[in-house]
Amino acid sequence: MERIKELRDLMSQSRTREILTKTTVDHMAIIKKYTSGRQEKNPALRMKWMMAMKYPITADKRIMEMIPERNEQGQTLWSKANDAGSDRVMVSPLAVTWWNRNGPTTSTVHYPKVYKTYFEKVERLKHGTFGPVHFRNQVKIRRRVDINPGHADLSAKEAQDVIMEVVFPNEVGARILTSESQLTITKEKKEELQDCKIAPLMVAYMLERELVRKTRFLPVAGGTSSVYIEVLHLTQGTCWEQMYTPGGRVTNDDVDHSLIIAARNIVRRAQVSADPLASLLEMCHSTQIGGIRMVDILRQNPTEEQAVDICKAAMGLRISSSFSFGGFTFKRTSGSSVKKEEEMLTGNLQTLKIKVHEGYEEFTMVGRRATAILRKATRRLIQLIVSGRDEQSIAEAIIVAMVFSQEDCMIKAVRGDLNFVNRANQRLNPMHQLLRHFQKDAKVLFQNWGIEPIDNVMGMIGILPDMTPSTEMSLRGVRVSKMGVDEYSSTERVVVSIDRFLRVRDQRGNVLLSPEEVSETQGTEKLTITYSSSMMWEINGPESVLVNTYQWIIRNWEAVKIQWSQDPTMLYNKMEFEPFQSLVPKAARGQYSGFVRTLFQQMRDVLGTFDTVQIIKLLPFAAAPPEQSRMQFSSLTVNVRGSGMRILVRGNSPVFNYNKATKRLTVLGKDAGALTEDPDEGTAGVESAVLRGFLILGKEDKRYGPALSINELSNIAKGEKANVLIGQGDVVLVMKRKRNSSILTDSQTATKRIRMAIN
C-alpha cells in the first residue's frame, strides 16, 4: 500500500509525467534488448501499437493506381506522405478491406490442387463420425506414427528433386529422376500446375507435404494410421477418449496395410518351398501392390513388421535392430549376455537343447495390445512390469516373458510332448516349441510359477495365477502397471544377414527375426495385390491354381513344346508345376506321373506323334516324381471345388474343355487362352506315324476285343487284326501288314482312311 501511495504522489507532480512520457530511453541495456537482431521481442504489443496508427502498412507505389484514395464511406485508404526511409506508400487497414471486396480476382482452379492435403482433410472430417466421449484411464504409449495423411513415399532427396523440377524447372543444378514414382509424380504435377499463380515457395511446401512421410514419436492409445493421428487431439486426452470413424481413406495407410498382408502371404508361402530365400525374392520381385512394384515400396516404406522386415532383409536393406519373439518387439535397453547351449528336461522328461543367454539384461517389450519392461538374469526372471488393454493381452505378454526368461520352473511346467512344426512340416526350434505349448494352455505355467506378497506402489498392482488383479499378492516378479511402455523411438537401421530359411541375424549373429514370428492373421488388402509368381497361385484356392497352370502352359507353349521334345526332365522340374501337385490326390501322384511320362515317351519315340491338346492337358501331372507301374488310366482326378473332379485322358470334361472350332481352352468354365497352332495338324501326323505298318480297315469291330493302346500294337503278329485307340479317344480297326515294303505309303493313306473311319 505504501508503495502505491508513493507512486500516486509522484504521478501528481507534472514533472514526473513529463519525464515518463517525453524523455528518450537511453539505458544501453534496454536499447540493446529491444533493438538487437531482426526478431520482434514483443510481437503482440508491437501489433497493437502498429494497428493503433492510421497507416500501419506500407505498400509498393503501384498501389496508388490500383486503389482509390478514399472508399465509399469517404475514409482515406492511403496517405500521400511517403514512408520514412523508403519509397513506399503508407496504407490504412481499410485498404485491405477494400481490396478484398473490390480488388481483382484470380483463377481459383489451382487452389484445390496445391492445397490438396488440406482440402482432403476437410472432406475426411466432414464425412467422419464422432461418437460418444468415454472417461477412463488411457494407457498411451509413444509410438512412431505417420502424421501426414495422403502422402507418397519418396525419400527427402527424391522429393527435393521432384519439387525443384516441378516448381523451379529453370533453376540450375543436376536433378536425377530415376524411380518410376518420381517420374509419374513429376509429369502429373507439371500438368496440374500449369499457369499457377500461387507463390512458388508455398507450392514447394505443399508438395513436400504430399510427397514425404513425416513421422513423430507420439503417445497413442488407439489407431495408429495417419487418418487417426490427424485427429489425435480430438480423440484422446489424459482421462477421456472420443470414438471416431474417419470419413475417408488415404493411400499411404492403404499401402502400409496392403504391404503387410502381401509380405505375410509371401513369407508363409516361401517357408514351404524347397529354397525359401530364393522363392521369397522371386515373389517380392514379381508382386505389385496398387500397381507399384513391391520392391520399390519396400525400399521406401518405413513400416516395421516382422514379415515386411524379413522381405527387406532378403533384399539387403537395413532394418531396425530390435528383435521379435512371440509377436513382441524386444529392445535391449541395458546389460549384455553370451549364448551357451544347454540340455534340459521338460516336465515330460523330453530333452531340449536350448541356447541359454547368460548375463543380466533389461528389455522393453512392445506388442499390438500390451507392453512391458523385463529385467532378467541367467535363466531367471527378476522383474516384469506389464500393461495392456485387457486381461487376455496382459496374459499373452506374461507368457512370452516367462518363456523368454528360460526359467527352470517354466520348462518343468511342460505337460506332454513338444512336437510343433512349421508350415513346411519342420520341427520348430525349442524356444518356439515352448512358446506354442504355453500359448495353447498356460494354466500349469502360472500355477507353478509361484506368488509373493507385494508392497503398495503407486500405479502398480499384482496379478494372480488366474489372471485376476490383486493388491496383496502377485505372480513372482510380475506387476501390472497403469502406464504403458513406450515403443523404441530410434529410427536407426542396421545391416543384417538372412539365411536360406529366412532367419534374420544382426552382425553379432543374434537372431532378430524368423518366419515363426510372422503373424497368422489374415487381413483383406485395401489395394489390389497382384502376385505374378506361380508360387502365389494357390492363395486364391485350388481353382485358381488349375486355371493359372494351364494359362501358363498356353502362354509359353512355343518354349514348352521344344522342351517337351528335347529336354522333358527340365520341363517337369519347372516351379510353375509345383502348386498343381497339391491338387492331385497324394496316393495317385506318382502313378499318374509314371503313366503320363510313358505316354509322352511313346509320342516322342514314334516320329511325328504329337497331340498338342493332350500334351497340354496331361503335362502338369508329369511333374511329380514318377512311380514305375503298369497302371493305365482313362481319367485323372484333381481335387477342386471340395471334391475330386475328373480330367479325361482322351476327350473333354468340365475341368478341361478344348473347343476345336474356336481353338480356345476353358478350365472349369474359365477361359484359359487360345492355342495359336492348329492341334489337328499335329494330330494328323500322330495317327499316321503310329499306324505305319498297319492297314486301316474301318470303324471299331467289337469281335476283335477291347481297344489296344498305341504301344500294345507292337505285340500283334503280321496279318492279325485289332481295335486301336487313337488321338482324341477314337477307335479304329487295323490289320498288321504282312510285308514291310509298302510302309511309306501308309502315312498318306492312313490319314485319309482315319478320317473316313471316324466320320
UniProtKB/Swiss-Prot annotation:
The UniProt keywords, alphabetically, are:
Cap snatching, Eukaryotic host gene expression shutoff by virus, Eukaryotic host transcription shutoff by virus, Host gene expression shutoff by virus, Host nucleus, Host-virus interaction, Inhibition of host RNA polymerase II by virus, mRNA capping, mRNA processing, Viral transcription, Virion
The UniProt site entry described as Avian adaptation is assigned to 627
Q: What is its main location?
A: virion
Q: Which Gene3D superfamilies match?
A: Polymerase Basic Protein 2, C-terminal domain (3.30.30.90)
Motif Nuclear localization signal at which residues? 736-739
InterPro entries referenced in this protein's UniProt entry, alphabetically: Flu_PB2_2nd, Flu_PB2_6th, Flu_PB2_C, Flu_PB2_CAP-bd, Flu_PB2_middle, Flu_PB2_N, INV_PB2, PB2_helical
GO cellular component terms, A-Z: host cell nucleus; virion component
Q: Where in the cell is it found?
A: Virion; Host nucleus
**Gene Ontology molecular function:** RNA binding; RNA-directed RNA polymerase activity
Q: Which GO terms describe its biological process?
A: 7-methylguanosine mRNA capping; cap snatching; DNA-templated transcription; symbiont-mediated suppression of host gene expression; symbiont-mediated suppression of host mRNA transcription via inhibition of RNA polymerase II activity; viral RNA genome replication
Domain of life the protein comes from: Viruses
SUPFAM superfamilies, A to Z: PB2 C-terminal domain-like
Q: What does this protein do?
A: Plays an essential role in transcription initiation and cap-stealing mechanism, in which cellular capped pre-mRNAs are used to generate primers for viral transcription. Recognizes and binds the 7-methylguanosine-containing cap of the target pre-RNA which is subsequently cleaved after 10-13 nucleotides by the viral protein PA. Plays a role in the initiation of the viral genome replication and modulates the activity of the ribonucleoprotein (RNP) complex.
Give the protein family.
Belongs to the influenza viruses PB2 family.
HAMAP family listed in its UniProt record = INV_PB2
Share what the entry says about its subunit structure, partners included: Influenza RNA polymerase is composed of three subunits: PB1, PB2 and PA. Interacts (via N-terminus) with PB1 (via C-terminus). Interacts with nucleoprotein NP (via N-terminus).
The protein in question is named Polymerase basic protein 2
Source organism per entry reads Influenza A virus (strain A/Goose/Guangxi/345/2005 H5N1 genotype G)
Q: What is the lineage of its organism?
A: Viruses, Riboviria, Orthornavirae, Negarnaviricota, Polyploviricotina
